[in-house]
Amino acid sequence: MTTTSEAQGIEALVHVTGAIRSAVESVIDGKPDVVRLAVTVLLGEGHLLLEDVPGVGKTMLAKALARSIGCSVRRIQFTPDLLPSDITGGSVFNQERAEFEFKPGAVFSNVVVGDEINRASPKTQSALLESMEERQVTVDGTTYRLQPPFIVIATQNPIEMEGTYPLPEAQRDRFMARVSMGYPPPAAELEMLERHGAHDPLATLEPVADAETVRRLVATARAVYAADVIKEYVVSLVRATRSSPDLRLGASPRSALHLMRAAKARAAMHGRAHVLPDDVQELVVPVLAHRLLPSADAQLARRAPADVLTGLLATVPLPRARPGA
């Protein structure tokens, strides 16, 4: 049974996330589903990977979300000569004090926009690993905590694009979700010409929240109830990827945690204090697909991981309420 305070928290979450989505959609035309997923990842304490060809608005979406929530934001342009210390920071000698002091890197921000992350070397890409999972950075044996909220929104071009490096499996697994922007519909593209021709909409975008508000929203989403049968459903879906003959690498235990958190966030955004199977099903592909590697036979048959997941959704039994539950 939902208490009055829980109901009020959910109501406030619906109101604020609606305002955030409206603010971002005032800049990003014709992509409401992508914007909704980005906000879901934010509430689920995850990180978002935006993958698509250049020029479809990946970086613009990341900047718009950061500005709409009124949090500190740093942008990292990933290039082949970018160093790990540029991301994490490092010790710099202070001549006045005659001692080394820590200079924070670009990762010390609420929102980190990693632009074209797969253009940097794997060594530099891996500099994000600790910060993404543990919300901390260790430099020269000293650990520095990152202040919440903390979200990495990384963009990458398809791997067949020139000058790109594939993201390691360990790093892909740390992104809660991946989404492709796609080209906008004709009407949205015309609206973009009108809107961006007159002024830069990002420059006039006003924040509709702040860091403290986002922290409260995250806590509200985390408290959403998930019944045991829902948790078992999530585990069944994840384990099904590991036994599928179409996949040579299935989903990790971390992916089950990400799927559960994202489902709770989606439920809260729909005004509910409990998770439904629909919440899980809606997020299976964006949360799991980028972690999976197809088998050789699946590649020959052109069966992408997203297609395999769609098939698993049709075969894994839906959860049923237990007698007396």
Regions inferred by a protein language model and the residue ranges of each:
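Pre-Walker A (pre-P-loop) alpha-helix and adjacent loop at the N terminus of AAA/AAA+ ATPase modules
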Residues: 9-56, 235, 239
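Walker B catalytic acidic pair
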Residues: 52, 115-116, 127
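Conserved alpha-helical scaffold flanking the Walker A/P-loop in AAA+ ATPase domains
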Residues: 36-40, 93-114, 142
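Canonical AAA+ ATPase core
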Residues: 94-99, 120-124, 132-224, 264-269
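C-terminal engagement/docking regions of AAA+ P-loop ATPases
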Residues: 2-7, 11, 241-325
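Walker A/P-loop
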Residues: 42-79
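P-loop (Walker A) phosphate-binding loop of NTP-binding proteins
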Residues: 52-53, 87, 155
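Conserved beta-strand position immediately N-terminal to the Walker
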Residues: 48, 112, 150
